[in-house]
């Protein structure tokens, strides 16, 4: 037993509380799987009559209040034809006079979406549902002119029952009113139907929405008990006798267990059928080997299968302890996490699975093994991807409770929270990646009329989460140390603390409760920007409104990465950290909130191009993976003969630096910090040559570990731009209308060396079954439109995002041109989906 007392333990998909019996011990992210799977649809594949239809095609959109737009006969012929997901604000234009907190984009307003569709006569008598993954904000859904449903939280998924309003064998019209004027935000929220929509057509007797709940109350290496609870709805006027069969499929798709149970479902009601199945020699879901099972649920009436669905789950144990952090499948795992906002950079809030997959691939390459969905429920596909990629998730429902989300002068907090938490938990509880339910972020004590954190509110929210899933800890991200001296946090199973070792006070009051560093760092930098002399303090920022990439700057309330590394080494009772943030995001452009439109916090820029800081984290979080990175660039025509400090980020413990073949000496990382100054800790994690005299040519770093060479890197002085280099992230795409290809655009000299100061305007042309979805450069100050066919390079680089067209596919040819440079070409393939 843990001598500190309370330890939270959990198991399996949403497993029951239990002790993990394994005795093995490990610390770190573990090996990274060599192959990243594509996104999962999580749609039913069981052999039933249920249809799950992609409802993203053939919409029309118009901005404005437009009275009568809900009626079927409304004239929408002049509306814009679009395909979901759609963020109406990302196309701009930017407003230079706006504050940058929400990205300077026109997200406030009213918009209408309309779509016509026809249902077969054979579907008469069946149920028709419309499932929205996320609409920003306050959507009202009309079917054939009748209000069919609405929702009041822009980040939450919801279902609309269209059955009473649809017609069969003739045209139906769905109209969605979206109103962001009442939405409150601290960052760019987007606007519109920004996540996918599906239409589900099923039998009147069917598995309820999110109606399958899988847990594993017992688990050992020899066997696992898998508990499957199936909620069946009956929309008939008479009771229905049902038989529910559950078939468990192993990671290889083979049947590993079956079970069946019968019960009566009352007319117009529902019934839960509870079954337990035994699985021999279970394969565990883990960070390095995320094995997944499938629970196939089949509903029979009168011996005939009338409905069914597949539910993905995983088998694992985990626990958080007060003294030793996080344990997964019996071994300690340090959480190396990143906070991610919901926007996809130049794509805005519009959610594309490939865009998220790419973000997660980049984070995992850095050494990330955990993601925090700050500060809202994510798109369901994010959790699908984390399940498949072996990333654990801090799943967050709300930001502040005092009016910065959709609860603006609305219903009482507890009533609002109950509705959102129900959908949040039952939607996500089958994901093995989810290990924490977070009910809030940075909520201060209750004062005046603000709905802040009170013991009553925290207990209510926590208990309501546990009502739907008692198998995971309930937490919140806190930022006011004084709150630890009050009973406000008593109802939480664990707490996250944001910044500056604020968790120390909480540790004193709650020595038996686990702690996690829910936001760390908030360091700041601009990709490719270097300014000398170096800053002497973390808040000494450039007058050019960019932030130096020598990685010396942070927000006033936060610290540079090295100081956080030191904390995590010292405070081993902390389960790990979630860095703010993995990627730059639209809005919150500290420290230039008036001038800029996107953040400087990211380890990776807005377009997904790594900053220098990426390699600092990689060298620390992946000590067994070769990392050798030199900064700054080596093109300083105005500093010949002057000092240019050189840093090397490496997983090695030492490195030698050579300039034009001449050694500038070998540096070794300190094992202990001798210098107590703010930047003294950097010598433990970086290698620095502060007295390098700049001469053009070749700068080379050779890294060593335990005396053996582990790798090298070279930086060369660039000549004048001579060519455009195009590098697609993938060669083969799917012709779905929603697949993406990210093409890195660079200016290079005649030898192929990146020109790090180039700012050429690049023009693009696409031929074939794809289109330009967006362009960007990672410049937080740029007010160039994202939806365009041209872009200025930012420190030598830009990014173009291609989106496929639905259809037979074919070759996609991209041409890039710039004045004075030869045209560049690249070809990728778009393949039809069978």
Per-segment meaning from a language model:
Residues 28-46, 148-149, 168-204, 284-300, ...:
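Glycine/proline-rich low-complexity spacer/linker segments in large multi-domain proteins
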Residues 28-131, 184, 190-193, 583, ...:
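Extended carbohydrate-recognition surfaces in non-catalytic/accessory domains of CAZymes
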Residues 65, 108-213, 235-236, 251, ...:
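Accessory beta-strand-rich segments of carbohydrate-active enzymes
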Residues 72-75, 240-245, 287-294, 651, ...:
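Short flexible loop/turn segments that cap and initiate beta-strands
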Residues 81-87, 91-96, 151, 196, ...:
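Extended substrate-binding grooves/exosites of carbohydrate-active enzymes
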Residues 162-164, 275-284, 687-694, 786-806:
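Short, hydrophobic beta-strand segments
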Residues 167-169, 229-321, 689-697, 703-706, ...:
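Extended acidic/polar, glycine-enriched regions
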Residues 228-232, 298, 632, 646-650, ...:
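Beta-strand-rich structural segments
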